[in-house]
UniProtKB/Swiss-Prot annotation:
Span list, region Disordered: 347-392
Biased composition (Basic and acidic residues): 362-381
Entry-linked Pfam families: zf-C2H2_FBX41
The keyword Zinc-finger is annotated on this UniProt entry: yes
Role, per record: Involved in the regulation of neurogenesis. Negatively regulates neurite outgrowth. Involved in the morphogenesis of basket cells in the somatosensory cortex during embryogenesis. Involved in the positive regulation of oligodendrocyte differentiation during postnatal growth. Involved in dendritic arborization, morphogenesis of spine density dendrite, and establishment of postsynaptic dendrite density in cortical pyramidal neurons. Involved in homologous recombination (HR) repair pathway. Required for proper resolution of DNA double-strand breaks (DSBs) by HR.
Gene Ontology molecular function, alphabetical: zinc ion binding
Organism taxonomic ancestry: Eukaryota, Metazoa, Chordata, Craniata, Vertebrata
Keyword terms of this UniProt record: Coiled coil, Cytoplasm, Cytoskeleton, Metal-binding, Neurogenesis, Phosphoprotein, Zinc, Zinc-finger
Principal localisation: cytoplasm
Quaternary organization: Homodimers. Interacts with NDE1 and NDEL1. Interacts with DISC1. Interacts with PARP1. Interacts with MCRS1.
Organism whose genome encodes this protein: Pongo abelii
Protein name: Protein ZNF365
One of the protein's GO biological processes: positive regulation of oligodendrocyte differentiation
In-chain residues carrying the UniProt-annotated modification Phosphoserine: S16, S138, S369
Localization per record: Cytoplasm, Cytoskeleton, Microtubule organizing center, Centrosome
Length: 407
């Protein structure tokens, strides 16, 4: 009956445990080999959500025995012999090899893999457990003897191991939860820092884009300014050339004006001399005409002819002198008086005074003289001119006699 009970205590997952892969040591006893897990927590979560609470007892046996070494299982099988049942509690306390799960999980938590608890040697468990079954079968006879409660000892051992394992799993879970909380806090802190860094990066990117945009705008402004400066320089050069050309034209125009002013002054002087000579001749002609008229009125024609000859000889004095007739001047006392040095000096002074007059005055005099010449003559003047026209033929008739007398 004990052997039958022991065989009934074996689970169906123990028969196919030899084909377990090393990479995924934990499998679901209800689902089979196709559902395997790398960590104990993953298997436990699967059992909690997929199977009933009674199936968790399989998890304790499935995860306990792979962590036990061959020697530990041999010693546990030896504890079933008579005489050693009393010290089984001490042996288990001396060699709690299942506590290695906590150290393994703690080491893996340091390696940033808190969710993976890998069994030490899951394959060796199959061999050890089969050996233990054979030994248990061989020891059925002695254990079935009177006075040896083998079933109670096994049940108490399993309960003790289950309790220890549950406490260990709870401790591991608490440690893992603490570690998860710590890692969650660190992750939240790192996430916040990452968000801050990302916000700063986005802000710096925006600033960089703004700076690049301003740089492009300033580059465009600089290009436009350079083009404007080049255009203004070209315009300045053209303006300078135009100014130089205008200055040359102004200088040329000034020279032309100076030359024209000089010519105008010379022309005015010549015109003034011509007008003065003309006025003198007119005055002389008027005097001669008046004298002739007065002589004609008084009937002294001989005296008139003598005076006319003296006047003509005085007017022709330079020609006579140039021809070399000094005796003609010496024979006439009136001509000597006319060409006296004092008289010549007086005429020179008069000419100098007239030359020193302003151009406006000369122009005014010229205009007045032109007006006098161009104005219509009055009645007396018409008579005078008529008389003058009548006198000229007489004077022309008397000229040969006067010339003969001069010769």
């Amino acid at each position: 009956m004990q052997q039958k009970a022991f065989e009934e205590s074996r689970y169906p997952w123990q028969e196919s445990f030899e084909n377990v892969a090393v990479c995924l040591p934990f499998r679901c006893p209800r689902c089979g080999d196709h559902t395997r897990f790398r960590s104990l927590s993953s298997l436990r979560a699967h059992l909690e959500f997929s199977h009933s609470y009674e199936e968790r007892t399989l998890l304790t046996k499935c995860s306990l025995f792979p962590s036990l070494k061959d020697t530990d299982l041999v010693t546990s099988s030896e504890l079933l012999k008579p005489g050693k049942l009393q010290s089984s509690g001490n042996v288990v306390k001396q060699k709690p090899s299942y506590v290695n799960l906590y150290s393994i999980s703690h080491e893996h938590s340091k390696d940033r893999k808190p969710f993976e608890v890998v069994a030490e040697r899951p394959v060796s468990y199959v061999q050890t457990y089969t050996a233990m079954d054979l030994r248990a079968d061989s020891l059925d006879g002695p254990r079935s003897g009177p006075g040896l409660p083998t079933s109670d000892t096994k049940a108490s051992f399993e309960a003790h191991v289950r309790e220890k394992f549950n406490r260990m799993v709870e401790a591991v879970d608490r440690t893992i939860e603490k570690r998860i909380d710590k890692l969650t806090k660190e992750l939240a802190q790192k996430t916040a820092e990452l968000l801050e860094v990302r916000a700063a990066f986005v802000q710096l990117t925006q600033k960089k884009q703004e700076v690049q945009r301003r740089e492009r705008a300033l580059n465009r402004q600089v290009d436009v300014a350079v083009e404007m400066i080049a255009v203004l320089r070209q315009r300045l050069t053209e303006s300078e050339e135009e100014l130089l050309r205008k200055e040359e034209e102004v200088v040329t125009f000034n020279h032309f004006l100076e030359a024209a002013a000089e010519k105008e002054v010379q022309g005015k002087a010549r015109l003034q001399d011509f007008i003065e000579n003309l006025v003198q001749r007119v005055e002389l002609a008027e005097k001669q005409l008046e004298y002739y008229q007065s002589q004609q009125a008084s009937g002294f024609g001989h005296d008139l002819s003598g005076h006319v000859l003296t006047d003509i000889s005085s007017n022709r004095k330079p020609k006579c002198l140039s021809r070399g007739h000094p005796h003609s001047v010496c024979n006439h006392s009136d001509l000597k008086a006319h060409f006296h040095p004092k008289g010549r000096n007086h005429l020179k002074k008069a000419k100098d005074d007239r030359a020193s007059m302003q151009p406006a005055k000369a122009i005014h005099e010229q205009a007045e003289s032109s007006r006098d010449l161009c104005r219509p003559p009055k009645k007396g003047e018409l008579l005078g001119f008529g008389r003058k026209g009548n006198i000229r033929p007489k004077m022309a008739k008397k000229k040969p006699t006067a010339i003969v007398n001069i010769i």
